[in-house]
Amino acid sequence: MASRKEALVRRANRVRRQIKAVANGRPRLSVHRSSKNIYVQVIDDVAGRTLAAASTLDGSLRSSLKTGADTAAAAAVGKLVAERAVAAGVKEVVFDRGAFIYHGRIKALAEAAREGGLSF
């Protein structure tokens, strides 16, 4: 039986394999969630570069957030990464939720990124 870590890695790889099949050259909006913070970056897999990034540890967000571990913080990060991605010239991405289910903080981040101008 697989350990929790092995199962997490297997789920993340499965999601990434599905994303690469439908990406068509679009950058990937990759999300990582920890118990205290949430991190997101827009990655161009063809060039191997990060085009935009944001997290609850950003100086511009950290002072305005009560905690980095709630849906309000995730929505603020989603809006910030959308602004930075649009400024970098990215409007269409594929959403990489990794091994995390599309619920709660992940869903709040995705909806805020859509409202901020990203389409996926």
Swiss-Prot record:
Coiled coil: none annotated. The keyword DNA damage does not apply. InterPro entries: Ribosomal_uL18_bac-type, Ribosomal_uL18_bac/euk. Pfam families: Ribosomal_L18p (PF00861). One of its GO terms (molecular function) is 5S rRNA binding. GO terms for cellular component: cytosolic large ribosomal subunit. One of its GO terms (biological process) is translation. Keywords: Ribonucleoprotein, Ribosomal protein, RNA-binding, rRNA-binding. It comes from the Bacteria. Gene3D superfamilies: 3.30.420.100. SUPFAM superfamilies: Translational machinery components (SSF53137). Belongs to the universal ribosomal protein uL18 family. Part of the 50S ribosomal subunit; part of the 5S rRNA/L5/L18/L25 subcomplex. Contacts the 5S and 23S rRNAs. This is one of the proteins that bind and probably mediate the attachment of the 5S RNA into the large ribosomal subunit, where it forms part of the central protuberance. This is Large ribosomal subunit protein uL18.
